A protein has these predicted regions:
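A short, structured surface patch at a secondary-structure boundary
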Residues: 42-96, 100-106
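Bacterial N-terminal signal peptides that target proteins for export
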Residues: 3-24
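Short helices/loops that flank or line small-molecule/ion binding pockets
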Residues: 91-97, 224-232
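Extracytoplasmic substrate-binding proteins
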Residues: 38-42, 111-190, 212-216, 271-307
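Short secondary-structure boundary segments
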Residues: 47, 105-106, 128, 218, ...
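His/Asp/Glu-enriched short active-site or ligand-binding loop at hydrolase and phosphoryl-transfer sites
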Residues: 67, 196-221
Length: 307
């Protein structure tokens, strides 16, 4: 009798032990599940340069939306597209239930950003980067927000090497007897061609490549064909703002330009076929991945001319 009582008691204890173990495991699982959900990142990226960094940090899976200036590869076609990064809609963003909105320093309007903050959505602006130091700081900030600090180390190393390569190309070009003269033109449907002078994003790219921007005024100005012809540019850089979805090749763009402005065929750039396109993304957000790439392309063109 005593043996049977002890056996029943032991069975009861074991059953309770198994019950508490199962309860503990289920509780831990629920905690881990809740913790995982709380750490889930749903990102809205507003600004071409910011979105480039998100992709470079291998954080595309976190994106729920980007603004209209951002370029996305085809496999991310399902990511929602918002409006212009200066004119964002709070309702459009909140409908996507993001946890984080990151944009350039001109992201806005402030009324929209304030509504998002009141809804407990984290909003972060990254300063425009005119120099390498700020670009690297922006990468670190974004990497911490997206939990990609390991990716940031490699990205910063890669960009530093590319900028170092541009510095070396600048030195090579500085040894030429005459510094190449570059003209940047912005073409926009319904408006005349505008030339980019000092203080523009194009001016930064030209300087990075080690060349001279022959437009000596500040900002953008409209110039006639005769005015451009008098400058005698060695290379013409073109960027377009249009509703056309398919990008044109350098040759197609050059042909379209010379058809519209035939006098430019008499410039050194027109005679030698040195008219090349500049991706619109390279002109947004200051020094970034696209701007560095554009400077590399321009430097390569100029070095080939010198050979």
């Amino acid at each position: 009798m005593l043996f049977q009582a002890n056996r029943h008691a032991n069975q009861s204890v074991n059953q309770w032990r198994l019950f508490f173990q199962a309860l503990t495991l289920s509780t831990l699982a629920a905690l881990f599940s809740t913790n995982a959900l709380s750490q889930e990142i749903k990102l809205v990226s507003a600004g071409a340069g910011v979105t480039e960094l998100v992709l470079a940090l291998d954080a595309a899976d976190e994106l729920v939306a980007v603004d209209s200036t951002s370029y996305l590869p085809e496999h991310l076609a399902t990511v929602a597209k918002l409006g212009y990064h200066r004119m964002l809609s709070a309702e459009g963003i909140m409908a996507l239930s993001p946890t984080l909105v990151v944009g350039s320093e001109v992201m806005g309007p402030e009324t929209t950003l304030n509504v998002l903050k009141q809804a407990k959505i984290e909003v972060v602006k990254l300063p425009s980067s005119a120099y390498e130091k700020q670009l690297m700081t922006n990468i670190d900030t974004l990497a911490q927000l997206l939990k990609r600090t390991d990716k940031a180390i490699q990205l910063k190393q890669d960009l530093h090497q590319r900028l170092d390569g541009l510095n070396k190309q600048q030195q090579q070009l500085s040894q030429q007897q005459t510094q190449p003269k570059i003209l940047f033109m912005l073409l926009q449907e319904g408006r005349g061609a505008r030339v980019g002078g000092k203080g523009t994003a194009a001016d930064t790219i030209i300087a990075l490549a080690g060349a001279k921007n022959i437009a000596d005024f500040e900002g953008y100005k409209s110039l006639s064909q005769e005015g451009i012809l008098s400058l005698q540019p060695d290379v013409i850089l073109l960027s377009t703002r249009s509703e056309q979805s398919d990008p044109q090749t350098d040759e197609q763009t050059a042909q379209a330009l010379l058809k519209e402005m035939p006098l430019l065929a008499h410039t050194p750039a027109g005679k030698n076929g040195h008219i090349q396109t500049l991706a619109p993304q390279a002109l947004l957000g200051g020094l970034g991945i696209s701007a560095i790439g554009a400077a590399e392309d321009l430097a390569a063109t100029l070095l080939k001319q010198d050979q």
